[in-house]
């Protein structure tokens, strides 16, 4: 799933897609993501399922709110329409701002079903 997320989003930000966090000197905009949970599939036959689920938080980071929000919508569209997995937003994105950097961001959780 990790490679599939990268492959789905890399074209939006010139390959600047990172699990967990980006290097400090990464040019903006960029995307980070991390798994924050998911559903477990249990079978009565005690077998390993061929699918897995992850709730993935996707973060967009940009220099301005005016550039972060449209990119967040592009991320949502790219994940929803990916042929590599099935992704469904859990809710709309939430805006954020880190005054220490400073950087504008969004975060949105997606339930992603993929091959195991």
What is the predicted role of each segment?
Residues 1-46, 66, 70-77, 82, ...:
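Small/polar-rich, solvent-exposed N-terminal microdomains that initiate assembly or binding
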Residues 49, 61-67, 87-92:
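Short C-terminal domain-edge/linker segments immediately following a structured domain
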Residues 50-63, 104-115:
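Oligomerization/assembly interface segments of phage tail-like spikes and tubes
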Residues 52-56, 66-73, 93-98:
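Low-complexity, flexible helical/coil segments
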Residues 77-116:
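Acidic-leaning, charged glycine-interspersed low-complexity segments
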């Amino acid at each position: 799933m990790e490679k599939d997320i990268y492959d789905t989003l890399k074209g939006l930000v010139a390959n600047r897609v990172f699990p967990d966090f980006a290097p400090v000197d990464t040019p903006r905009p960029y995307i980070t993501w991390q798994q924050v949970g998911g559903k477990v599939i249990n079978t009565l036959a005690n077998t390993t399922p061929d699918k897995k689920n992850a709730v993935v938080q996707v973060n967009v980071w940009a220099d301005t709110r005016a550039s972060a929000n449209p990119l967040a919508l592009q991320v949502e569209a790219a994940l929803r329409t990916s042929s590599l997995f099935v992704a469904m937003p859990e809710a709309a994105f939430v805006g954020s701002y880190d005054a220490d950097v400073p950087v504008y961001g969004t975060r949105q959780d997606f339930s992603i079903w993929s091959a195991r």
